[in-house]
Design a protein with these regions (language model features):
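Short mixed-charge
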Residues: 26-36, 236-260
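Short glycine-/polar-rich loops that comprise or flank the Walker A/P-loop
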Residues: 39-42, 70-74
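Residue-level signal for alpha-helix termini/capping positions
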Residues: 22-26, 208, 285
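RNase H-like, metal-dependent nuclease domains and their acidic two-metal-ion catalytic environment used
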Residues: 2-11, 39-64, 85-250, 274, ...
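Conserved RecA-like P-loop NTPase helicase motor core
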Residues: 260-284
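Short, conserved "post-DEAD/DEAH" coupling segment immediately C-terminal to helicase motif II
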Residues: 10-38
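Short amphipathic C-terminal alpha-helix that caps PH/PH-like domains
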Residues: 17-21, 284, 355-361
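Conserved AAA+ ATPase "SRH/arginine-finger" region at the nucleotide-binding site
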Residues: 77-82
Length: 390
């Protein structure tokens, strides 16, 4: 009997576990016998739904075998079956819980729905889950570390598809100043319909809180509107403090303000898609990316507003980030270029986009070792001697 079989990949099962149950047990003694009443050779898989993986493919195969009467059977149901028979929580209690829990958590644990992409997923979701090693979010700079901010600007003015996502990353370097880890210490999703002024103020607040080295903004399409806005002087409507105007590092856009902070890198992602995707895949495969730990869902249901916002919400946003990544399939275009496609249009990729923009910038613009930055001195490879006068 395989408990929580969704967590088991098919290679390990075929190599280490399946051979055990294929051999029936025998009695002890000089003439061991097989018990004819014991159900030998049967394998029972018990699991909740999960991200689509090899176990998902096994379930599909078993359903087809059951239809073809090959001796296999698949049973499953959602929370509604238990409610129908009066078991556990009531329908109203579960629907109220659905409003508070992560969509992925509720879909897999209560609705028996497998989530994500099983075909050409951009990265192995199990590897992504293994990156969740950070115990708690950071709500401001620790005073000594190096922070960067990635921003994906809403692509539409529609309220159901108008979320700007902001990802905060902390860089850990090795002895040669090369990037060793990028820790995602906070993720913020702005409310639907927030105008450019509100978005700019939110970005500036976060830049000030973390003393971020750079703010990476996608300036394709509507992103130019946010770029224009962050180059203006603002006053925080909550604290009343002045928020300095930003200026760009790599574009010809210039602020009209006399005093500016040159920290914005404008990225035009359409021409860099392949490099952006490859850098993201490399960070996941190498373990260089680190994410916030999975949060106890009971803590979400029982948390007060302040604790939920400041401590729990970044972990929930990380959960939604993984859901976005699991929903993406990798596609190869003509000429060998890469792009990603959403399998379910109901799941956006705002958090993913903000994350990969930031990773690309850090790995391509901020990843030079000390040796690479040292000035070239021709005297170090050539010998010169002063001429002798005869």
């Amino acid at each position: 009997m395989m408990e929580e079989s969704a967590l088991l990949n098919d290679h390990v099962f075929s190599d280490a576990l399946e051979p055990i149950v294929n051999i029936p047990r025998r009695t002890i003694g000089s003439n061991p016998q097989i018990d004819p009443c014991e159900m030998n050779g049967q394998i029972h898989f018990l699991t909740t739904a999960y991200f689509k993986n090899t176990e998902y493919e096994r379930c599909l195969g078993m359903v087809k075998d059951m239809a073809n009467l090959t001796g296999k059977i698949v049973l499953g149901s959602s929370w509604e079956l238990a409610c129908e028979y009066g078991r556990g929580e009531t329908r109203s209690q579960l629907l109220a819980k659905k409003e508070k829990l992560s969509p992925t958590f509720f879909a897999t644990n209560y609705e028996s729905r497998w989530v994500g992409s099983s075909d050409a997923c951009i990265v192995d979701v199990n590897k992504m889950l293994n990156l969740r090693t950070l115990p708690k979010a950071e709500l401001k700079s620790d005073g000594k570390s190096e922070y960067y901010i990635g921003v994906d600007v809403a692509r539409s003015t529609k309220t159901n598809n108008n979320q700007t996502s902001i990802v905060v990353g902390k860089v850990k370097r090795d002895k040669k100043d090369k990037v060793k880890h990028i820790q995602i210490v906070n993720i913020v999703n702005l409310p639907n319909g927030t105008n450019f002024t509100g978005q700019a103020i939110a970005v500036k607040r976060l830049q000030k809180l973390y003393n971020a080295v750079s703010v990476i903004i996608d300036i394709n399409g509507l992103g130019v509107g946010l770029l224009d806005e962050v180059m203006k002087l603002h006053q925080d409507p909550i604290t009343g403090e002045e928020l300095i105007a930003f200026d760009t590092i790599n574009t010809e856009h210039e602020s009209d303000e006399a005093e500016t902070l040159r920290c914005v890198w404008g990225i035009q992602a359409q021409g860099l898609n392949t490099d952006i995707i490859v850098n993201f895949i490399n960070m996941v495969e190498s373990g260089g990316l680190q994410l916030l730990e999975k949060v106890d869902q009971n803590a979400i249901a029982n948390a007060d507003s302040d604790f939920l916002t400041n401590r729990i919400l970044p972990h929930v946003q990380t959960e939604l980030l993984i859901e976005e990544v699991a929903n993406l399939s990798l596609e190869q275009l003509n000429g060998g270029k890469l792009t990603v496609k959403r399998n379910s249009k109901s799941i956006d990729k705002d958090r993913y986009s903000a994350l990969v923009y930031m990773i690309w910038y850090i790995m391509t613009q901020q990843n030079k070792s000390r040796e690479e930055e040292e000035e070239f001195n021709i005297a170090s490879i050539c010998c010169f001697s002063s001429p002798k006068i005869r």
